[in-house]
From Swiss-Prot:
Biased composition, class Basic and acidic residues, residue ranges: 35-47
Record-linked InterPro entries: DNA_mismatch_repair_MutS-lik_N, DNA_mismatch_repair_MutS/MSH, DNA_mismatch_repair_MutS_C, DNA_mismatch_repair_MutS_core, DNA_mismatch_repair_MutS_N, DNA_mismatch_repair_MutS_sf, DNA_mmatch_repair_MutS_con_dom, MutS
UniProt lineage: Eukaryota, Fungi, Dikarya, Ascomycota, Pezizomycotina
Keyword tags: ATP-binding, DNA damage, DNA repair, DNA-binding, Nucleotide-binding, Nucleus
Coarse class of the protein's main subcellular location: nucleus
Function: Component of the post-replicative DNA mismatch repair system (MMR). Heterodimerizes with msh2 to form MutS beta, which binds to DNA mismatches thereby initiating DNA repair. Msh3 provides substrate-binding and substrate specificity to the complex. When bound, the MutS beta heterodimer bends the DNA helix and shields approximately 20 base pairs. Acts mainly to repair insertion-deletion loops (IDLs) from 2 to 13 nucleotides in size, but can also repair base-base and single insertion-deletion mismatches that occur during replication.
Locations listed in the record: Nucleus
Composition skew (Polar residues), residue ranges: 21-34
Start and end residues of each stretch annotated as Disordered: 1-143, 172-205
Name of this chain's protein: DNA mismatch repair protein msh3
One of the protein's GO biological processes: mitotic recombination
Compositionally biased region (Acidic residues): 127-136, 173-187
Length: 1117
């Protein structure tokens, strides 16, 4: 049969792709059909099928010919044949006649156009259409064959393409939910729409679970919801996008909005991301660390109880069970293990701080605000409150924020502009002075907030009083009275915090009013925010880590709770001389050789206390403690109490100092209670978190025993049924098997006669080529009963465990006191380790305000430097020399020297030994510093403005018992103004305030002030150095020693040389410096000559002022 030229050529690279038909092909002579009637019938059938398919385009399954034709360019296939014999057509018809009718592929629009244009008759037009349909089918088969070969060569279904297909299949929420929970399957979809409208329409009806998720999300729009679906927790919509970004997991595309917005109408499901159930807390911790609020939505019913209930056809009941933020996350299992935080890391305090303030009064520098704060540490139960007035610099707020270092802030009402900017500055940056990003929430404050807060707090604590035992009536009434006497602003904060913590289920922390502390109690030295940063008390100023800080230097603790207590000691040094002496005497006793055995015993006990007992106790109090964690905590308490079981009174402890005796004597007092709780617990089951066997048999509740008996009864009936099933199958006895977690399966061989005896009522569960596995109706019924008993047993076990936690929580205070005693011992041992270092001495405490130190050293620099630190003496006394004017070359060690003095004073009042040869310290009530140069762009304040504002705050707060450090005051303005301000401030500090003062300056003119203090209240000292060489070879050697007198040069050009400024630039600067020095020297010489002339005159011979000026001018020359 003749073929057209386009078909007769062999396959080549040019015609491997499908080409558009030419006009001549329609006029080529066609072969005559041997059965015209049959052919005509087939044509009619194909036209009918083709028409049907055009109407059902949107119902075509994926990978149809239409989809494949779009990818023709990507698939290499042989050139198609144009005609086939009638025998072949008949054969194809016969092959497909038994199966379902095959839907013909719709012709392309271009083909239909050509047929309409060139066909001479309907009959003639049908035949080319028939060829196109057959050609498409053949091409489809060839493509499928090629695809199978392609997949086979890549490695089968496990290759990359196969994996991707599996993943995309699993991503379907309906399939996933069906696998995890049958009751959460998608609702029955409406019949698919016909015609092209179906392609434009989106997914249509929501599933019951999706409606459930939308309802929950609308109530909790401020949270990222992790929803339990079977064995996974899933995020939906916008939550999925956030979770995918923060957790680096896959987000399956879909709808991101929950308001059914028209822009997402074409999407048929929500975007989703998922995490495994056992990894929940790992991912939750990452989300809250990023600053998010996370809600956990759990299935609160199980499949067995659901199947037995009335809502078996409804989705699982789900409920928001937990809400977490950075401050309220107490379920951190990792934080309970390990002794202390890693070296160099910043120890987060975990405080949640609530702040409110009244409307600002005054304007500008006279602005005043009244502030109230309440800070809660949910992980330990500590509560700090304060009520104070703050000035326009907001230094008081800054001090408290830096001391408490909160991880979360709750702002009640609107803050003033200055306060809000300060809070945002401290909390807003990714890595700030707190070491991490701080979460900030805001809540409204009504005009009647004070009255509402008083009423709310009163009712909250009144309920606690009512529920208290009769024996606790006095304590409860005292508790209520203490709370009602709180200041108004504190009450507002307390009420807001109670409401806020109720959302997280942690409101019970406010029951522990024994641990309420006032921040501003004057029993501690005041270290304000500037001091904490300048002296690097908690963090260094380089990377804000703890390495290189005073806390890092003193921290040798072995436990987490000991580390937290030491942090409080370092930030709040004592003012009580008797308590200080008691603490330092205890350290002296711990480091003595006579007590080595007892010290090793204490260290051994602390070394065994691997868990964070303080956090475990508060988790028990909240009812959040896990079974293995409870066992660990109780066993640790038992070990501690038994270790000192021989101590019946403080005198039996083996030490002489009261603080050690009382701490050790309190440890064995809890032994009886701890043993009573441990005796209820099955050790092996608790360790393996087995809730069903957690309690010893004698301690099990009636409900637990009842359901265990019910399970045993059902299992007995199942064993009895074995013989019945055997009779049905004609066997003597059958054995149950368990496959893939499915119990009580009855196995029957496929090729045996027993298979014919299996009743039709038996349900086939699984099978292989050789075996079939069945459940009979009786087995199914009994298994359902067993599952119901199991679920009820689980609920009974959880209830009994919660009751045990509540019973232990009733003993919270004695247990907490024991842990606090252990933390005190840990801190004292840490400080004794510091005291054992060479060069540390026990300080002597004086009643007057003084600092007398011989050969003192900087505690942190000494540890960080490999070279030996140059020691220096310090002598300051309120009745003698109470101020030092420190001068010296740049980089000569001035700042290190004054910091060293302040740090030794702080260490002494912490109760630690100090790095010196000898030390006599008075009780300082505060340390104030004004160091460094920086502006405050947020407040529109220049460097000099900030400098003077901080100085003004110091002058208002400092007392004769304070230590004040001022570093280069006045450098932010012109020399004349700077000198004038510095001189006035220094004179006021020494003469009027009478504070101990260290004043660093490069203004040599100030050195003459010593002459105005005849009793040597002010003294000049300088950092010594040596000069060698001259000109370009001039070198300065820093000795880092403190000497008497004044350094008349700062040697700034030496620093320029060390900074590698260009040599020509340095030479020009040196020339200009020499010219200026000569000019100033000539002026001073002229002034000196003028003074001499005045003195020589008869009228001024006895003028002492002129003689003093003469001496000063001569010294400056």
């Amino acid at each position: 049969m003749p073929l057209s030229s386009s078909q007769s050529s062999p396959p080549s690279s040019q015609n491997l792709k499908r080409k558009q038909q030419t006009i001549s092909s329609f006029f080529t002579k066609k072969p005559q059909s041997t059965k015209p009637e049959e052919s005509h019938g087939a044509d009619e059938k194909q036209r009918t099928n083709g028409a049907e398919e055009v109407g059902n385009e949107n119902r075509a399954p994926p990978h149809t010919a239409d989809a494949a034709e779009e990818d023709d360019d990507d698939i290499v296939a042989p050139a198609p044949k144009r005609a086939r014999t009638n025998a072949h057509r008949q054969k194809d018809t016969d092959q497909t006649s038994d199966g379902p009718p095959r839907i013909a592929e719709p012709p392309k629009s271009s083909q239909r156009t050509e047929l309409a244009k060139f066909a001479s008759s309907p009959a003639g037009a049908a035949e080319p259409e028939e060829m196109d349909e057959e050609e498409a089918q053949e091409r489809k088969k060839e493509r499928e064959k090629l695809h199978k070969q392609f997949v086979r060569r890549l490695g089968g279904p496990d290759c990359l393409i196969g994996i991707n297909r599996h993943v995309s299949g699993e991503a379907d929420p309906a399939l996933e939910e069906a696998a995890e929970a049958d009751e959460d399957e998608e609702a029955v979809q409406a019949p698919p729409a016909k015609g092209k409208a179906a392609a434009k329409k989106g997914g249509g009806k929501l599933t019951p679970m999706e409606r459930q998720i939308i309802d929950m999300k609308r109530k909790h729009m401020d949270k990222i919801l992790a929803v339990q679906v079977g064995y996974k927790f899933r995020f939906f919509g916008e939550d999925a996008r956030v979770a995918a970004k923060e957790l680096s997991i896959v987000c399956i595309p879909g709808k991101f909005r929950f308001d059914e917005h028209p822009s997402e109408a074409h999407l048929d499901r929500f975007a989703s991301a998922s995490i495994p159930v056992h990894k929940l807390h790992v991912h939750v911790k990452r989300l809250i660390t990023a600053g998010h609020k996370v809600g956990i939505v759990r299935q609160i019913e199980t499949a067995a109880l659901k199947a037995a209930g009335d809502n078996r056809n409804a989705p699982f009941v789900r409920k928001l069970t937990n809400v977490y933020t950075k401050g309220t996350y107490i379920d951190d299992m990792e934080g309970l293990e390990g002794p202390t935080a890693g070296a160099g890391t910043t120890a987060a305090t975990g405080y949640m701080l609530c702040i409110t303030e009244t409307n600002a009064k005054g304007w500008g520098n006279d602005e005043k605000v009244h502030v109230g704060i309440v800070a809660v540490q949910p992980a330990t139960g500590d509560i700090v409150f304060d009520d104070f007035e703050d000035g326009f610099m907001r230094s008081e707020i800054e001090t408290r924020l830096l001391h408490l270092a909160p991880c979360e802030l709750l702002i009640v009402g609107d803050l003033s502009k200055a306060s809000d900017k300060l809070v945002q500055h401290l909390a807003g940056s990714k890595m700030n002075v707190f070491g991490d990003k701080v979460r900030v929430e805001r809540t409204t404050k009504s005009k009647t907030a004070a009255a509402e807060a008083h009423s709310h707090v009163s009712s909250f604590y009144a309920d606690k009083v009512k529920s208290a035992n009769a024996s606790d009536d006095t304590q409860a009434s005292n508790l209520l009275q203490k709370v009602l006497n709180l200041p108004e602003q504190v009450s507002i904060c307390l009420s807001s915090m109670i409401k806020h913590m109720t959302e997280y289920g942690l409101e019970h922390v406010f029951d522990l009013t024994k641990y309420f502390q006032h921040f501003s109690s004057r029993s501690h030295m005041l270290l304000n925010g500037n001091t904490l940063m300048s002296l690097e008390i908690y963090q260094n100023q380089t990377d804000h880590s703890s390495r290189g800080s005073l806390f890092w230097t003193l921290d040798r603790t072995q436990t987490r709770f000991g580390q937290r207590l030491l942090r409080k000691w370092v930030g709040r040094p004592l003012l009580d001389k008797s308590k200080l002496e008691e603490r330092v005497n205890a350290i002296e006793e711990l480091k003595s050789m006579e007590k080595v055995a007892m010290v090793e015993r204490l260290k051994g006990v602390l070394g065994k206390a691997k868990c964070d007992l303080e956090k475990i106790l508060i988790r028990i109090y909240y009812g959040r403690c896990t079974r293995p964690e409870l066992l660990t905590g109780l066993q640790t308490l038992q070990m501690i109490a038994q270790e000192f079981g021989d101590v019946k009174s403080p005198e039996d402890s083996g030490f002489t100092t009261p603080i050690l005796n009382e701490a050790i004597a309190s440890l064995p007092t809890i032994l009886e209670d701890v043993l009573s709780f441990l005796n209820k617990i099955n050790l092996h089951a608790a360790r393996n978190d087995d809730k069903y066997e957690f309690f010893r048999e004698a301690e099990e509740t009636e409900d637990i025993s009842e359901h265990k008996l019910g399970i045993a009864s059902v299992e007995h009936e199942l064993r009895e049924y074995q013989s019945v099933a055997g009779k049905i199958l004609g066997r003597s006895k059958i054995q149950y098997v368990t496959v893939a977690g499915i119990d009580y399966l009855i196995e029957v061989e496929n090729n045996s006669s027993y298979l014919k005896r299996v009743p039709a009522s038996w349900v086939k569960i699984s099978g292989t080529k050789k075996l079939s596995r069945f459940h009979s109706p009786e087995v199914i019924k009994l298994l359902r009963q067993r599952d119901q008993h199991k679920e009820a047993l689980a609920a009974a076990c959880d209830h009994a465990y919660a009751s045990l936690l509540a019973e232990i929580a009733a003993n919270y205070q004695p247990f907490r006191d024991c842990v606090q005693s252990l933390a005190t011992i840990d801190c004292l041992l840490s400080l004794s380790s510091i005291a054992n270092q060479p060069g540390y001495v026990k300080p002597e405490y004086a009643d007057n305000t003084c600092i007398h130190v011989e050969q003192g050293r900087h505690p942190m620099v000494e540890q960080l430097l490999l070279d030996s630190y140059v020691p220096n003496d310090i002598n300051l006394d309120s009745e003698e020399t109470r101020a030092l004017l420190v001068t010296g070359p740049n980089m000569g060690g001035k700042s290190s020297y004054v910091r060293q003095i302040a740090l030794i004073a702080i260490m002494g009042q912490v109760g630690s030994y100090v790095p010196a040869q000898s030390a006599k310290l008075g009780m300082l009530d505060a340390v104030f510093t004004r160091m460094g140069a920086f502006d405050n762009m947020l407040a529109g304040e220049s460097t000099f403005m900030v400098e003077l504002s901080e100085t003004a705050d110091i002058l208002k707060q400092a007392t004769p018992r304070s230590l004040v450090i001022l570093d280069e005051l006045g450098r932010g303005t012109s020399t004349h103004d700077g000198v004038a301000i510095a001189q006035a401030v220094l004179d006021y500090m020494v003469r009027s305030l009478r504070s101990l003062t260290l004043f660093i300056t490069h203004y040599q003119h100030l050195s003459s002030m010593v002459h105005s203090f005849p009793n040597h209240e002010l003294r000049n000292v300088h950092m010594r150095f040596t000069e060698s060489g001259s000109g370009q070879d001039e070198e300065i050697t820093f000795l880092y020693e403190v000497g008497e007198g004044v350094a008349h040069r700062s040697y700034g050009l030496n620093v320029a040389r060390l900074a590698n400024l260009p040599v020509p630039l340095i030479e020009v600067a040196k020339q200009k410096s020499a010219e200026l020095e000569q000019k100033i020297r000539r002026r001073r010489l002229a002034g000196l000559m003028s003074t001499v002339e005045n003195i020589m005159s008869d009228s001024a011979k006895n003028d002492e002022g002129l003689i003093t000026r003469l001496i000063s001018s001569a010294e400056q020359l």
